[in-house]
């Protein structure tokens, strides 16, 4: 145990008085943190403080709830890094959907028989596809979980007794059902609740995210509001630009915005909005720019992101991906892969594939070992024996040197055998999300299908595994998937009506898409390019009637708008 008065932040990091006060706060608190404010680090340090000072002593735990799987995974990894494996075992990180599903799956039996779901029920996205028996939406699942905890006071008491501290990340994206669920369990309890978010980055408004969630939380939980403005991510000029855009779109009351604007001077080489004639020329020019960043500016490919509002059938990513490949630059489309890799099964599989394709990789081995030991509790002799069996299996399944010519079918067989031999019986027991539905099969085959495709673009299995892991590859994803990530350079592709205002514009829709754009802008550290094309094969002639409202604001505050003719070479 460390005394709270002498506790210091981990990793040699220093925090200002406000951030340190948030870390050490032992009452309900809401934190409004702008882009680049380091909220993941602050939450990780707060978890360390709570665990190391024994404010949350064994057998109590910390519950962390996120909206996205990768966010839940990121905060768990950061806490493990900051306070070590043993203490971080008591930091339980879930998505809100996974947490509510775990309650439904484990305690559904407390309901009347006619209210219980069928075995193997399926989660659907559209309420029209649900029947509340064997098919239901995530909102219906949350409503059912809320009914269960209301129906069973003992269960509610158990949850409260298990989790003394609660973190809720991306709080602005919780909808009414999810907020009511959290409120029902933890409001007026002994649990201490911390919520973190940024209303400017509320990208789940289309899913009925609460517009006044922070106000409700402060009122219901008697919480204090703290605001962190500091942006540690972006360059000074980009930070100024982002701040100005945020103030223009969501002005504070009783503040003369125009009088307080410090206009950013943005270099056109690093911050521009390009208009191309068609998507082919767009892809060629932007690929050359990415190649220039890699070769001349020494930016690693994985530090470059190409973002889109939507990417159905890879319409937006395919052209630029092909052009990059012609230049010898690999890219990976993470829109689906990102979810798979954030799963425990995804981490097991990617660690295994890494060890299949390299003589040794310490990080991959430690990840695989820790996940295996997490599944099995046994004595040290049994552990050593089982781990030696895993190592023997890996050594006999090489996909480099003499094994470099093995086929995908060989790799699939080895992967299936490994999972059956070492993880199968425990997988859905330890991680309940695999008990029902298709998530286990989707994750396993989703990753291997991506690997098969990556092998067609690579000269070896090692390169293919690197590619799907995002090593040495430009990353392509939707803006929603980029939430919480940061990159040295960002290209926002397809700023046109079809992507953002296909069904027209209302004030609500404009506010929603401003938040989406704001998330994209704030992913960049030092370079930000925005692109549109007058023609695309899948949409035809592009229109800018509605999106011009956003474009005009971007140029007003410093983004350079440039027309790039088809005849132009690397004008950009």
Regions found by a protein language model. Name each.
Residues 298-425, 432:
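ATPase/helicase motor core of nucleic-acid motors
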Residues 5, 11, 48, 181-267:
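Conserved RecA-like helicase ATPase core segment
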Residues 223-224, 231-327:
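Helicase P-loop NTPase motor core
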Residues 376-481, 502, 558:
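Accessory C-terminal helicase-associated subdomains
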Residues 93, 129-165, 175-181, 460-463, ...:
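Conserved helicase/translocase P-loop NTPase motor core
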Residues 93-102, 196, 452-505, 512-535:
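Conserved helicase core region in the C-terminal RecA-like lobe
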Residues 1-108, 522:
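P-loop NTPase Walker
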Residues 388-406, 496-572:
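C-terminal accessory regions
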């Amino acid at each position: 145990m460390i005394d709270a008065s002498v506790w210091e932040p981990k990793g040699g990091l220093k925090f200002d008085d406000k951030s340190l006060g948030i870390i050490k706060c032992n009452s309900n608190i809401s934190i409004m943190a702008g882009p680049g404010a380091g909220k993941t680090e602050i939450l990780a340090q707060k978890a360390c403080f709570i665990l190391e000072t024994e404010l949350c002593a064994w057998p109590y735990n910390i519950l962390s709830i996120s909206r996205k799987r990768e966010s839940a995974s990121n905060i768990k990894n950061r806490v493990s890094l900051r306070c070590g494996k043993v203490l971080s075992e008591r930091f339980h990180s879930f998505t809100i959907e996974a947490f509510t599903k775990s309650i439904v799956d484990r305690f559904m039996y407390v309901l009347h028989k006619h209210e219980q779901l069928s075995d193997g029920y399926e989660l659907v996205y559209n309420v029209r596809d649900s029947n509340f028996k064997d098919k239901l939406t995530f909102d219906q699942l949350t409503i059912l979980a809320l009914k269960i905890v209301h129906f069973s006071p003992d269960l509610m008491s158990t949850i409260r007794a298990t989790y003394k501290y609660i973190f809720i990340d991306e709080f602005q994206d919780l909808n009414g059902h999810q907020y009511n669920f959290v409120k029902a369990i933890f409001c007026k309890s002994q649990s201490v609740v911390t919520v973190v978010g940024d209303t400017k980055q509320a990208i789940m408004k289309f899913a009925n995210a609460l517009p006044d969630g922070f106000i409700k939380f402060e009122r219901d939980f008697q919480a204090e509001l703290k605001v962190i403005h500091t942006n540690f991510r972006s360059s000074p000029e980009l930070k100024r630009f982002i701040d100005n855009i945020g103030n223009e779109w969501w002005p504070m009351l009783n503040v003369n915005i125009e009088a307080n604007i410090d206009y950013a001077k943005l270099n056109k080489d690093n911050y521009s909005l390009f208009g191309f004639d068609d998507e082919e020329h767009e892809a060629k020019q932007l690929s050359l720019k990415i190649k220039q960043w890699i070769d001349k500016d020494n930016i690693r490919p994985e530090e470059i992101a190409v973002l889109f509002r939507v990417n159905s059938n890879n319409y937006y990513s395919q052209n630029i991906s092909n052009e990059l490949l012609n230049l010898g630059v690999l890219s990976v489309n993470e829109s689906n892969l990102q979810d798979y890799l954030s799963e425990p099964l995804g981490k097991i599989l990617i660690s295994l594939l890494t060890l299949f394709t390299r003589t040794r990789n310490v990080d991959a081995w430690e990840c695989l070992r820790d996940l295996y030991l997490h599944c099995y509790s046994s004595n040290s002799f049994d552990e050593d024996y089982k781990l030696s069996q895993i190592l023997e299996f890996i050594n006999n399944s090489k996909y480099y040197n003499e094994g470099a010519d093995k086929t995908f079918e060989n790799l699939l067989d080895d992967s299936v055998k490994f999972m059956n031999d070492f993880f199968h019986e425990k997988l859905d027991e330890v991680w309940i999300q695999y008990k029902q539905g298709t998530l286990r099969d989707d994750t396993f085959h989703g990753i291997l299908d991506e690997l098969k495709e990556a092998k067609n673009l690579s000269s070896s299995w090692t390169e293919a595994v690197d590619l799907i892991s995002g090593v040495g590859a430009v990353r392509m994803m939707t803006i929603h998937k980029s939430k919480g990530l940061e990159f040295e350079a960002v290209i926002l592709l397809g700023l046109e009506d079809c992507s953002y205002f296909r069904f027209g514009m209302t004030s609500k829709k404009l506010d929603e898409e401003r938040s989406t754009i704001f998330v994209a802008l704030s992913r960049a550290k030092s370079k930000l390019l925005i692109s549109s094309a007058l023609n695309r094969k899948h949409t035809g002639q592009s229109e800018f009637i509605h999106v011009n409202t956003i474009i005009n604001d971007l140029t007003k505050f410093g983004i350079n708008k440039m027309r790039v003719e088809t005849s132009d070479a690397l004008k950009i």
